[in-house]
Amino acid sequence: MSITKDQIIDAVAELSVMEVVELITAMEEKFGVSAAAAVAGAAGPAEVVEEQTEFDVIMTTFGENKVKAIKAVRAATGLGLKEAKDAVESCPVAIKEGISKADAEALKAVLEEIGATVELK
């Protein structure tokens, strides 16, 4: 005669907590297993995604109005006329480097308003 799963469940339900603990320990030893919950593989420390705090404003093209682009670059950087002209003509060029996100976005808006193509890195 074979014992069914239902009969085993009923028999376990009638045991005290201490008897269930002893039963589990005996089953672990008999079958060489552990009743502990399976633990996911050791994942390394959670990657911390750091928000970028410093940005470079790169002008890739100056658009159709080079004079306005030169004026905007001079105003933003304090460069002289020749240096600003050389910078604008050598696109793509970093207009400002290592500035805050707010300053970078403001400068980008000014440059895009005059028709320049700008990237933030």
From Swiss-Prot:
Q: Which UniProt keywords apply?
A: Ribonucleoprotein, Ribosomal protein
Question: Does Ribonucleoprotein appear among the keywords?
Answer: yes
Q: Name one GO molecular function term.
A: mRNA binding
Gene3D superfamilies tied to this protein: 3.30.1390.10, Single helix bin
> Which Gene Ontology BP terms does the record give?
translation
Supply the SUPFAM superfamilies for this chain. Answer: ClpS-like (SSF54736), Ribosomal protein L7/12, oligomerisation (N-terminal) domain (SSF48300)
Sequence intervals crossing the membrane: none
Disulfides per UniProt: none
Subunit note: Homodimer. Part of the ribosomal stalk of the 50S ribosomal subunit. Forms a multimeric L10(L12)X complex, where L10 forms an elongated spine to which 2 to 4 L12 dimers bind in a sequential fashion. Binds GTP-bound translation factors.
Protein name listed in UniProt: Large ribosomal subunit protein bL12
Q: Origin organism of this chain?
A: Psychromonas ingrahamii (strain DSM 17664 / CCUG 51855 / 37)
Q: Tell me the gene name.
A: rplL
